[in-house]
Amino acid sequence: MNPANYLILSGLLFTIGATGVLVRRNAIVVFMSIELMLNAVNLTLVTFSRIHGTLEGQIMAFFVMVVAAAEVVVGLAIILAIFRTRRSASVDDVNLLKY
């Protein structure tokens, strides 16, 4: 398959993720949109790695996945703390945690 198709798909996935981050107010949906954007970046890294015939892009994609796994743990803990205190998963309630 043509590598340009993978890059177009990656751009489309990143755009969908960015739209989800900017438009939605639910913390879980925003969190999933960020993960979608990270996976789009991974697809781009692997595509360029395949084009150039090197492993650097695949190694960087692996490290992005490791960081994303750590982000999942921390992000879900924060979302759970917000939900327990406010009974809502809205992004607007994040500012209220400091009171």
Curated annotation (Swiss-Prot):
Q: Transmembrane residues, as ranges? A: 3-23, 28-48, 62-82
- Pfam families noted in UniProt: Oxidored_q2
Question: What are the leading ranks of the lineage?
Answer: Bacteria, Bacillati, Actinomycetota, Actinomycetes, Frankiales
Function (record text):
NDH-1 shuttles electrons from NADH, via FMN and iron-sulfur (Fe-S) centers, to quinones in the respiratory chain. The immediate electron acceptor for the enzyme in this species is believed to be a menaquinone. Couples the redox reaction to proton translocation (for every two electrons transferred, four hydrogen ions are translocated across the cytoplasmic membrane), and thus conserves the redox energy in a proton gradient.
Q: Name one GO biological process term.
A: ATP synthesis coupled electron transport
Q: What class of enzyme is it?
A: translocase
Per the UniProt record, the source organism is Parafrankia sp. (strain EAN1pec)
The protein's name? NADH-quinone oxidoreductase subunit K
Task: Spell out the subunit comment.
Answer: NDH-1 is composed of 14 different subunits. Subunits NuoA, H, J, K, L, M, N constitute the membrane sector of the complex.
InterPro entries given for it? NADH_UbQ_OxRdtase_chain4L/K, NUOK/Mnh_C1-like
Question: Cellular component GO terms, alphabetically?
Answer: NADH dehydrogenase complex; plasma membrane
Topology of this chain in the membrane: Multi-pass membrane protein
Q: Which reaction equations make up its catalytic activity?
A: a quinone + NADH + 5 H(+)(in) = a quinol + NAD(+) + 4 H(+)(out)
State its Enzyme Commission number(s).
Answer: 7.1.1.-
Which keywords has UniProt assigned to this entry? Cell membrane, Membrane, NAD, Quinone, Translocase, Transmembrane, Transmembrane helix, Transport
Subcellular locations according to the entry: Cell membrane
Instruction: Output one GO MF annotation.
Output: NADH:ubiquinone reductase (non-electrogenic) activity
Hey, which family's this protein in? Belongs to the complex I subunit 4L family.
